[in-house]
Design a protein with these regions (language model features):
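C-terminal motif of bacterial Sec signal peptides marking the signal peptidase cleavage site
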Residues: 37-40
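Segments of small-molecule ligand-sensing domains
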Residues: 338, 344-348, 359-421
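Extracytoplasmic "Venus flytrap"
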Residues: 55-95, 117-123, 144-147, 213-219, ...
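Beta-alpha junction/loop-to-helix N-cap segments that form part of ligand/metal-binding clefts
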Residues: 58-59, 85-92, 104-173, 241-248, ...
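Bacterial signal peptide processing site
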Residues: 42-44
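Extracellular/periplasmic bilobed ligand-binding domains
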Residues: 156-158, 225-317
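Extracellular/periplasmic periplasmic-binding protein-like sensory domains
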Residues: 279-352, 366, 437-442
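An alpha-beta-alpha
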Residues: 79, 178-240, 262
C-alpha cells in the first residue's frame, strides 16, 4: 500500500565527535539501482542541555534534541524521488498526529517539533543530511527507504538515535534502535501467497513467478516467497530487476513461458503498472500479489488502471485509507479536512499510526524521567504493546529482533474506495507466517 523511495547519508556537518567511516555499495531497495556511498559520519553530538542536566518540567533528564519546551524529531524522507508519493503521505499522516498532540499539550509538557528533510531517495544525499540533522534531534520519527536504512545502520546504532524506518525489511530487525511499525516484507509475502492458495487461485504443483528489486526490499520479499513456495509445494521462478527499470515486458513474457499461475511483485508502483498492463495484454491474466509499497492510487488513472483493478492484490499490515476502524476513520476525517484537494493513499494512516507508536515510547521515557537517547532505548524495551486504535494490529515489542506483528490484510485497487484500495481479507496471521523464522529474527537488542 505504500509505494515510494528515499535515501540517506551522513557527512561532516555533524560535530567533532562525528567519525567518518566507509560506506559499502548500497543497492537501492526501492530506488536508484546502485549508489556508491563514499563516507558516513557518526554523530554523537552535544545538545543545548548537557546529558544528565534537568530538562525543566518535572526535572526530566535530557540530552540531544530536547529543551525545556520542545522535543525535536527528524523526518528524513523522499519528497521528490521515485517514492515521493509515499514519502509525502506518511509525512502528512505524522504531521496530522503531532499537530493534534501538540494542541493537547504535547509530551512531558513539551511541544513536538519536526525537522523534515527531503533526500530524493538518493543514498549519498541522505547520509549527508543525516549528519546535519542528527546533532539536533532526539531521534528520527521517519527514515524512509531500505537502502538508506542499510547505509545508516551503523550511524544509528552508534548515535543511539531511536528511529522508525519507513522500510519493512527484516534485515534491519537486528538494530536495537529501530522500531518497525507493522510486519516485514517477507511475512507480507508469506501471508499473501497463503491467501492465493486459500482462494484457490494457485495450488500445490503450480509454478509462480516473483519480480523483485535488487537490494534489501526486493530480496526480503523474495525470501518470503521462497519459504512459502517450499512449504506449499509450489515451484518458484524469480526475476530480479533494478529500481530504474520501468518496463517489465521481458520479465512477464519469460514468466508466461514458464507457465506461471501467479506473479509476486516486490517493486515500485511504476513497475507494478507495467506488470499489470503486460499481464493483461499478452493474455496471461494471472493474479499479481505485491508487497505494501507496490501500489499508488494515481495508477488507476493510467492505461494500466483496468488491469490493476482486475489482477492486483496488495498485502499490508495496516488499514488502507478507506479502512473502517475507529483509528482509520479518525485519520481520514482529519486528512480530508486538512488536505481536501490531495489524493490520499495508505501511507496516510500508516504515518499517523507510526507517530502514535513513537509517541508511546516518548511518553514512557517521560514517565521514567529520562528523555535522553539512552532513556528512549530503555523506554522502547519497556513498551511491549502499542494500540493504534485499529490502524495497525496490536504491536508487541517484547521480543527484540522479532516483527511486532505477523498479521496482514489483503486489499485490491478500487476506484470507488477512498484512497484507491478496498480490503478483501481482514488482518490475520496465517499458520504459515507464524512458523516462519527470518535470518535476523531474535537478534535485536
Amino acid at each position: 500500500m505504500i509505494p515510494n523511495r528515499s535515501t540517506m547519508r551522513g557527512r561532516g556537518a555533524a560535530s567533532s565527535a562525528g567519525t567518518r567511516g566507509r560506506l559499502r555499495l548500497v543497492v537501492a531497495c526501492c530506488a536508484i539501482a546502485t549508489l556508491l556511498v563514499a563516507s558516513a559520519c557518526s554523530t554523537k553530538a552535544n545538545n543545548n542541555n548537557s546529558s544528565g542536566k534537568s530538562g525543566g518540567p518535572n526535572s526530566v533528564k535530557t540530552d540531544i534534541g530536547v529543551t525545556d519546551s520542545t522535543i525535536n524529531l527528524g523526518i528524513l524522507t523522499d519528497l521528490s524521488g521515485v517514492f515521493a508519493v509515499l514519502g509525502k503521505s506518511v509525512t502528512q499522516g505524522a504531521q496530522l498526529y503531532f499537530a493534534d498532540l501538540n494542541k493537547k499539550g504535547g509530551v512531558c509538557k513539551r511541544q513536538i517539533k519536526l525537522n523534515i528533510q527531503d533526500d530524493g531517495y538518493d543514498v549519498q544525499k541522505a547520509v549527508g543530511i543525516y549528519a546535519d540533522m542528527a546533532p539536533n534531534v532526539l531521534g528520527f520519527e521517519q527514515l524512509l527507504g531500505s537502502p538508506i536504512n542499510a547505509a545508516l545502520k551503523q550511524n544509528i546504532e552508534t548515535d543511539k538515535a531511536f528511529t522508525i524506518p519507513v522500510s519493512w525489511a527484516s534485515t534491519i530487525l537486528d538494530n536495537p534502535n529501530n522500531m518497525i511499525v507493522g510486519t516485514t516484507y517477507d511475512i507480507e509475502m508469506i501471508n499473501g501467497i497463503q491467501f492465493l492458495v486459500d482462494q484457490k487461485k494457485i495450488k500445490a504443483g503450480d509454478t509462480i513467478g516473483h519480480i523483485y528489486l535488487e537490494g534489501e526490499y526486493g530480496e526480503d520479499g523474495y525470501l518470503g516467497s521462497k519459504f512459502a513456495a517450499k512449504k506449499l509445494g509450489l515451484k518458484l521462478v524469480g526475476q530480479k530487476i533494478t529500481a530504474t527499470a520501468t518496463d517489465v515486458t521481458s520479465q512477464i513474457t519469460a514468466l508466461k513461458n514458464e507457465g506461471v499461475k501467479a506473479i509476486m511483485l516486490t517493486a515500485t508502483p511504476t513497475q507494478t503498472a507495467s506488470a499489470a498492463a503486460v499481464d493483461a495484454s499478452i493474455g496471461l491474466n494471472v493474479p499479481l500479489l505485491g508487497n505494501n509499497p507496490v501500489y499508488a492510487p494515481q495508477l488507476l488513472e493510467t492505461a494500466a488502471g483496468p488491469a490493476l483493478t482486475k489482477l492486483l492484490y496488495v498485502a499490508a499490515s495496516w488499514q488502507p485509507y478507506s479502512g473502517t476502524t475507529p483509528g482509520a476513520t479518525k485519520v481520514r476525517d482529519a486528512y480530508s479536512a486538512k488536505y481536501p484537494n490531495e489524493i490520499p493513499n495508505g501511507g496516510v494512516p500508516w504515518g499517523y499510526g507510526a507517530a502514535a507508536a513513537y509517541t508511546a515510547v516518548l511518553q514512557k521515557a517521560c514517565e521514567n524521567g529520562d528523555l535522553t537517547r539512552d532513556g528512549m532505548q530503555k523506554a522502547f524495551r519497556q513498551t511491549t504493546s502499542i494500540d493504534t486504535d485499529g490502524i495497525l494490529p496490536a504491536l508487541d515489542y517484547s521480543h527484540p529482533g522479532d516483527p511486532a506483528t505477523r498479521e496482514v490484510l489483503i486489499a485490491q485497487p478500487d476506484k470507488a474506495s477512498k484512497g484507491g484500495l478496498k480490503v478483501v481479507q481482514d488482518l490475520k496471521a496465517s499458520d504459515l507466517a507464524n512458523q516462519y523464522v527470518a535470518p535476523q529474527h531474535g537478534k535485536g537488542g
